[in-house]
UniProtKB/Swiss-Prot annotation:
Keywords on record: ATP-binding, Nucleotide-binding, Nucleotidyltransferase, Transferase
NCBIfam families for the chain: PRK04149.1, sopT
Species in which this protein is naturally found: Bacillus cereus (strain G9842)
Protein name: Sulfate adenylyltransferase
Listed HAMAP family: Sulf_adenylyltr (MF_00066)
Domain of life: Bacteria
The gene coding this protein: sat
Spans through the membrane: none
Amino acid sequence: MSTVNELVNRIDETYEVSQIEKEIKLDNIALSDLELLATGGYSPLTGFLGKEDYDSVVETLRLANGSVWSIPITLPVTEEVAESLKTGEEVKLVNNGNIYGVIQIEDIFIPDKEKEALLVYKTTDEVHPGVKKLYERPNVYVGGTIILTKRFENNQFPSYRLDPIETREEFKKRGWKTVVGFQTRNPVHRAHEYIQKSALEIVDGLFLNPLVGETKSDDIPADVRMESYEVLLQNYYPKNRVFLSVFPAAMRYAGPREAIFHALVRKNFGCTHFIVGRDHAGVGDYYGTYEAQEIFTNFTIEELGITPLFFEHSFYCTKCEAMASTKTCPHGKEDHVILSGTKVRELLRNGEIPPSTFSRKEVVEVLIKGLKKEVVTE
């Protein structure tokens, strides 16, 4: 399937901002969203959502024009800031004293956050990290088209930070007609590896695209994860069939809705297929094991523009002596070693070394070293 959808480009580093007086301070989530809006990662969006699109996304998982979009990309400001703004004006977008862009204000509105929590996250429980963040952020939303006037400096992983136009170019250069995207916020364990390699059997290339934006505090730090991906790819994957690049967005933990969002974004990066495993983008027990796969039945592949590949929970079977899933293994649960990112994190934090059935030894070494460093700096 072709992914030649038009990429939005809202970057203009020559844009004159010196005459613009008013400013909105961006938090880290809004800052990463600004970059992804401008580079086309969030195509077809050209800015932060106005009320009509926001309501439509929250209620129907579509923009007002009917295009599929499942996560509201919003710019929250305080009541005090909102009172100083009016529609029709241009305002600077600032973070940490740097001007990164401007927004042409089209809308200023107060959202129903409880409704947003219930429909987007399926819960109003403030223990849920996505809901907690939603309630912590300011209460008024500003909508409008953006322009990115300054690219980010001091990026972590500069050599792995590619815009959608660049990843598309890379895939083309490699002659890949079909590319499967894999989203992760965890180190890659053996179950992930099994799924990725199964998918790689039917496409030309694998795009490993770990999320490195804001995550919850007990997730393994991005720099440690990146090193673990590097050693894994170096030792266990064919170099000409995989490509590693980071996804600078914040994690929403919105489960099924975020699975759709992750697929749409990977389409923009140039993927034709996207892997959806068990409890994709889930947290705790808020979502059913395969709910993130079931949500895709609400949309056609044509309107998504990308083909989801669904995988069941995989495990190491001691009888098969191999990675397997219930589709390929006849043995009972007592023979299955269940692997999960949570379990790997738990073992490591307790100072235990995960067995080789869980994780490659090179990966485990990187994680142990990284977590030791973390303890020292805490």
